[in-house]
Amino acid sequence: MTTITVLAGGIGGARFTRGLLQHLAATEPEAAVTVVVNTGDDMWLDGLRICPDLDTVMYTLGGGINEEQGWGRPEESRRTSAEIAAYGRGWSWFTLGDLDLATHIVRSDLLRSGSTLSEATEFLCRRWQPGARLLPMSDTPVETHARLAMDADEHRAGDLIHFEEWWVRYRASVPVTEFVQVGLESAVPAPGVLDAIRTADLVILPPSNPVVSVGTILAVPGIREALRSTPATVVGVSPIIAGAAVRGMADACLHTIGVATSAEAVGLHYGSRAGGGVLDAWLVDETDAGALPALAAAGIRSVAVPLWMRDSETTMRLAADALALGARSGG
């Protein structure tokens, strides 16, 4: 039985993994997939623990995602958020849907009752049946914050604000000097995460944000080391096509850490395992085929294929390309 581990953020990682599961259902139904999900976007809001990436992956794989926006539930209403706002509470820039609130309430109750985030996630997945094992990167609370380079509304230059505020409220338009993972120093991988990496036949870094999604997962002590030492082949899929982020504002994140917005630069940022990085192989889009020589020179086997996940067919084809590249790149 083939075992595959995916290190995923939100929308891009969720959609890729769905395509992977659909492809495997048709070609290798006995394959087992584990998804290690970024929890750096997590936060407390109005007494509830919000886990944006875990929920996006769970809803997407479980058939409950709002396909148009890529997050949240379809046919959602926001009456409760409106009532919270009427009390002068909550954040005007971050509203919680009424259906989505049920997930947050159940999760928060489980956490307050002594469950770990892993246990709460397992419980929530019993309803959604995502077809893969979902693991948070850590049960330790880790929250990504952005340090502002300039004043913004009530915030002053140098202040740290939660990543979701920078991402959702400011649409990554306010320059930042760094990203800080609060709580990272005491974090450990969640149970099963290291084993999922060490015992996999293939590890995939999907087209998620390389800085604050996959990058945050890799920053958890022990995970990068497990990737470097696993006997599995590690294949990445570029989140950059023709010099632009596929979704969101990943270019602003890359700029903050001094990495160019290109498939080549992100591949080199991850680095080859032979050179101390985490990649054996890297998929880039056909429009970025010119990057292949530089990537090969750095020890990263790369192939140019269509990367746009426009529908289930193209996403399944991309997943098949990742599997094929992994098979060709294995030791």
Predicted feature locations:
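Short Gly/Thr/Asp-enriched flexible loops that form oxyanion-binding sites at enzyme active sites
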Residues: 17-21, 213-227, 292-296
